[in-house]
């Protein structure tokens, strides 16, 4: 066949070449085949003793072109503020103290009442006199809130060793005739209209017993040194008597009387002079 004839002719042609040149020709053919399929860094000798260097290309992208290391991403979260303001609205006919107390228990927070506005009715206050400690007095009628001061502490955790602290609620009220009353609330504080309370919440209060043990030791040492000094004369008995009389005169309060809230006698308001 035609193809077989050409192959035979080529074989005869290579057979006529010298043995050394035939080996170089075969090596050149093999290197050309390998360089066609695989690019590698090789040196191929030729007939005229020259060399051809084939450089192999590395696979993949060059370093630094892509997929650079990214800086770590830090997710920051805003912490809860230590105190948050609240505006509490108590409708008419509700106990203001109990409403705020339920709000604190539901939210598990402590609340410090800053101010309040509105009107309340039938207020029961505690007697401030030490002689009548534990007794209360009730004022009937409608009163306007002038100031409110209260603290509702959050329930302490079970593992806490802090002593329980009682909550307190104090008010200052203005009566219909301009009289001013106030004190610790000892009963329901029923709202006669819509009452607005401005408060601030707090969490995890820290308890400290004052004075500390170090301060007590320091004060005891200074007291012993002061006790060795001679007493100072100068009418101490007279000043003590004056202080005692002044304390008795100032200790009389409208809450120490044994009258009901409706029987309290208020001072008459000053009248304007008649025109001439």
UniProtKB/Swiss-Prot annotation:
The name this protein goes by in its record: AT-hook motif nuclear-localized protein 17
InterPro entries linked: AHL15-29 (IPR014476), PPC_dom (IPR005175)
Region (Disordered): 1-80, 212-248
Presence of keyword Repeat: no
Gene field: AHL17
Organism lineage: Eukaryota, Viridiplantae, Streptophyta, Embryophyta, Tracheophyta
Predominant place of localization: nucleus
A matching Pfam family: PCC
Amino acid composition bias (Gly residues), ranges on this chain: 233-248
DNA-binding region residue numbers: 56-68
Compositional bias (Basic and acidic residues): 1-10, 212-227
GO MF annotation terms: minor groove of adenine-thymine-rich DNA binding
PANTHER family: AT-HOOK MOTIF NUCLEAR-LOCALIZED PROTEIN 15, AT-HOOK MOTIF NUCLEAR-LOCALIZED PROTEIN 17-RELATED
Function: Transcription factor that specifically binds AT-rich DNA sequences related to the nuclear matrix attachment regions (MARs).
Annotated localization: Nucleus
């Amino acid at each position: 066949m035609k193809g077989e004839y050409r192959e035979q002719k080529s074989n005869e042609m290579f057979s006529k070449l010298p043995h050394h040149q035939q080996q170089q020709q075969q090596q050149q053919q093999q290197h050309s085949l390998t360089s066609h399929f695989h690019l590698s860094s090789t040196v191929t000798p030729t007939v005229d003793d020259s060399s051809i260097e084939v450089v192999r290309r590395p696979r993949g992208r060059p370093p630094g072109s892509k997929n650079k290391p990214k800086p770590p991403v830090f997710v920051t979260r805003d912490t809860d503020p230590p105190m948050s303001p609240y505006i509490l609205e108590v409708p008419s006919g509700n106990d203001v103290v109990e409403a705020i107390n339920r709000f604190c228990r539901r939210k598990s927070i402590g609340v410090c009442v800053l101010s309040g506005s509105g009107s309340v009715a039938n207020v029961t206050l505690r007697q401030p006199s030490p002689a009548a400690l534990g007794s209360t007095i009730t004022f009937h009628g409608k009163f306007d809130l002038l100031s409110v001061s209260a603290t509702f502490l959050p329930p302490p955790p079970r593992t806490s060793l802090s002593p329980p602290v009682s909550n307190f609620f104090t008010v200052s009220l203005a009566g219909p005739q301009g009289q001013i009353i106030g004190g610790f609330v000892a009963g329901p504080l029923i709202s006669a209209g819509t009452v607005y309370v401005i408060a601030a919440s707090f969490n995890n209060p820290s308890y400290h017993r004052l004075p500390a043990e170090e301060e007590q030791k320091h004060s005891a040492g200074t007291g012993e040194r002061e006790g060795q000094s001679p007493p100072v004369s100068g009418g101490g008995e007279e000043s003590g008597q004056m202080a005692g009389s002044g304390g008795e005169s100032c200790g009389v309060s409208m809450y120490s009387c044994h009258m009901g809230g409706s029987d309290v006698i208020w001072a008459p308001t000053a009248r304007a002079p008649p025109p001439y």
